[in-house]
Amino acid sequence: MPTIAELLSQELGQKLEYIENVIALMDEGNTIPFIARYRKEMHGAMDDTVLRTLETRLQYLRNLQARRDEVKSSIESQGKLTEELAAAIDAAATLAEVEDLYRPYKQKRRTRGSIAREKGLEPLAQAIFAQDGSDPAVLAEAYVEPEKGVNSVEEALAGANDIIAEDLSDDPAIRKSLRELIARKGSLVVKAEDPEEDTVYRLYYDFSCPISRVMDHQILAINRGEKEEKLKVTVTLPGNEGPATVCRAALKPTMFISQFVKAAAEDAYERLIFPSVQRETRSDLSDRAYSGAIHNFALNLKPLLMQPPVKGFVTMGLDPGYRNGCKVAVVDATGKVLDTTVVYPTFSDRKKQEAIEILSRLMRKWGVSHIAIGNGTASRETEAMAVEMLRSFPNASYMIVNEAGASVYSASPLAAEEFPEFDVNLRSAVSIARRLQDPLAELVKIDPKAIGVGQYQHDCPQKELDGALGAVVEDCVNAVGVDVNTASKSLLLQVSGLNATTAKNIVAYREENGAFTSRAQIKKVPKLGPKAFQQCAGFLRIPESKEILDNTGVHPESYAAARELLKLLGTDDLATLSARLETYGAAAAAEKCGVGELTLIDIAKELSKPGRDPRDELPPPVLRKDVLEMKDLVPGMELTGTVRNVIDFGVFVDIGVHQDGLVHISEVCNRRLKHPSEMLKVGDVVKVVVLSVDEKRHRISLSMKQVKKQA
């Protein structure tokens, strides 16, 4: 039997040595970001996505092995564990297969079959199931015992039927065959609870789809409709194939067909096996759909967090609103709040002009060059006001910012701690401004589920969702690196090796002793021990340090190697260091510097651009100076937009009209896609052509593949 490491090696297509190394590193308490970045030689430079998959599968396989051992121990305690059964349990590849094998030996609640056994009818059931041509009624006469509760031949036969049906239901081979049959030929059939009622689920009022072809988003929508008691859902098989599968397994291949056993097999199918396997099938479909939804949420979240920051500018944040007005915050280039106010542009034309005058004064007073506008209530009116104002500021521009989660953050204890003197509403304006300046630093303060780029995220298992999204946030923060002297506690909390206590202690140490001047000083933070320092040091940046390496992704353990590399290749032109290393030969240089080749390549990359931010290499966000309305759109119009969400059936694109347009999956490109994420991610800047506009239903249909045709 293959080991867990061997199974993972086969599944992931990675060398066994690398898999064993990663497992050992994880068991020693090393984090995924640390392993991915600083132990590349040990795993052949697997990226964090592969390492996360490995971690998940490792946990599953370890749980599977633990369950195998539990099941074998339980069966052995009953004196029923054979070598064949133990081998079958060890060979079971999934938890479902293990449970199938355990099913006959599990302690059950009282069933019709167990009651019949208590009445002493098991020998009768075995005799009938032998199918040797004996008449079941004649065999049953010997089991009529009123004192045991068997008052007639009919009652004896009914009990025997229940035992046979239960035994067939517990047969793992039969259940597996039926499961495979449903997967191949089954259909998911959906009907309306009330066909006359008009609901959002009308699309599924008369829906049927092969199990093998039903889409994840369809499963999630159907599940929600069923939960809300708007839909009825069943799994069906064609003709008589389900009962026939059980009968084939139950009946012996002889000239004589036992009608009694056939009837018991059909009863087992209808009453016990099919309802159970149908539930399992629905559960498997849901698990698949939830996994897909969580995967898509994670795919969408990563580029959203990794949006390029708009650095070095004084920024105005506008949190639109009607009754409570438009909240305004001006922050400097570092995110420090300079000014706040509230204006009421939607109350009247006079109030709108008054708002423009107030904002114009703030623009001039603080030298504002960028405006971030939240995309929520009253966003359209606020944008129109901003565009009118910007006619007097030709060098300024604006961007609509996704404000999802801003209100949640502004009312949180974290926001109260950060801005105790500000009203809740003004805090959200600050958050919106900072989202333009540094999306990652601001979004880490918010529960990822509140960011709003998921599909049915509230229906997904929350533990799995939280784990997947938490991993994305952690990977993004560590990929970028964190300035230890300016980072919030929320941001530090996501750094490899740090926890709530050490993150809080770093902030406290900074406030008490002033800015950190070296990475080595981080060791003085209370409760931050050697292991935590090892895991976090490479991801913490100190721009103020006299040691240039402290502002790079080079780990302190490799400082000597970095200095040796500079001695070897010179320090004249750091920007060309990577190219010069390639010319010299990375393998030869690595040997001289005393580190692995992959590590040295990373060191050269970091030295060539100290303080580099991987987000700066991505396309910048689309900033605007004017505004479009839906009525301005006409079919054939070409526009540039930003991908806001990627879901199973397409992508939603912000084209600057307050209503994201949909590029259906069939309009993304000329080849067939299984999922839009094969081509696109959140934050991508794309060219689209308008296909149709439905103002009444607020729907815009777009195409990417037809852009060239229109050119």
Language-model-detected regions and their locations in the chain:
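Long, charge-rich intrinsically disordered scaffolds of nucleic-acid metabolism proteins
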Residues: 97, 399, 405, 410-480, ...
